[in-house]
């Protein structure tokens, strides 16, 4: 959800006397997935490379900077990223094809298209700042040795 969407949602809620809750686990430690703001991203390389090795190199670029990402991915994300409910643990990093429990998911359609497509970072929380999240992802992707 972009900033503009949040603005409209807030104004609509205001008009009806409601409030929006962006907490990633608004019901506390319940047995449900919580609320994330998964970030789908690509660049020219991801859309055209056709190389599993390139995708793996980009994913591996995230491994040493996990804490830098978590720092901007939203408050209380530790309550959502438990390793349960289709999430990886906040202290772990993984990636995989169509793996909804990974930190970064490589969509199956990307693989079916010959490794031409995008990646999905499943760690950002619903209350994260999309600009900070995008900035951190861009910095990491640009640092990848491909």
Spans of model-derived segments:
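Loop-rich catalytic cores of soluble enzymes, especially ATP-dependent carboxylate-amine ligases
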Residues: 14-127
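Short, small-residue-biased leader/transition segments that mark boundaries at the very start
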Residues: 1-3
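An acidic, glycine-/histidine-flanked metal-binding catalytic module
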Residues: 126-146
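Short, hydrophobic/aromatic alpha-helical segments in well-folded domains
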Residues: 5-8, 12, 58
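Conserved short hydrophobic interaction patches
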Residues: 12, 61, 65, 137-144
């Amino acid at each position: 959800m972009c900033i503009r969407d949040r603005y409209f949602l807030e104004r609509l809620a205001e008009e009806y006397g409601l409030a929006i809750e962006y907490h990633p686990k608004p019901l506390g430690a319940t047995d449900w997935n919580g609320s994330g703001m998964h970030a789908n991203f690509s660049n020219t390389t991801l859309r055209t490379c056709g190389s599993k090795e390139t995708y793996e190199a980009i994913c591996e670029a995230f491994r040493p900077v996990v804490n830098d990402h978590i720092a901007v991915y939203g408050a209380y994300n530790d309550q959502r990223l438990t390793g349960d409910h289709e999430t990886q643990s906040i202290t772990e990093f993984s990636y995989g094809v169509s793996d909804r429990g990974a930190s970064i998911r490589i969509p199956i359609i990307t693989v079916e298209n010959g490794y031409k497509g995008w990646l999905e970072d499943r760690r950002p929380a619903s209350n994260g700042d999309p600009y900070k999240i995008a900035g951190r992802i861009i910095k990491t992707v640009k640092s990848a040795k491909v």
